[in-house]
Swiss-Prot record:
One of its GO terms (biological process) is envenomation resulting in negative regulation of voltage-gated potassium channel activity in another organism. It comes from Cyriopagopus hainanus. Keywords: Disulfide bond, Protease inhibitor, Secreted, Serine protease inhibitor, Signal. This is Kunitz-type U15-theraphotoxin-Hhn1c. Disulfide bonds join 37-85, 60-81. Residues 28-33 form a propeptide. Expressed by the venom gland.
Length: 88
């Protein structure tokens, strides 16, 4: 039983890495800097409730941020999000 549980955990971790890793790579510039506008929305680790904005690749979209953690694709207003991420 322990081996089956271990294999399921390894499989789950593999799937999570396959989904997450390409998204992080596509957010990286050629010089290694991360383009925050290409990062996925990330609500963070806490359970507080802040309505903030992230750039979804096309436009700025509202989401709920928990108050701690997450990534830098998070803006206090739609205007700030568009100013940073929208291409002219």
């Amino acid at each position: 039983m322990g081996t089956a549980r271990f294999l399921r955990a390894v499989l789950l971790l593999s799937v999570l890495l396959m989904v997450t890793f390409p998204a992080l790579l596509s957010a990286e510039h050629h010089d290694g800097r991360v383009d925050i506008c290409r990062l996925p929305s990330d609500s963070g680790d806490c359970l507080r409730f802040f309505e903030v904005w992230y750039f979804d690749g096309t436009t700025c979209t509202k989401f709920v941020y928990g108050g701690y953690g997450g990534n830098d694709n998070r803006f206090p207003t739609e205007k700030a999000c568009m100013k940073r991420c929208a291409k002219a």
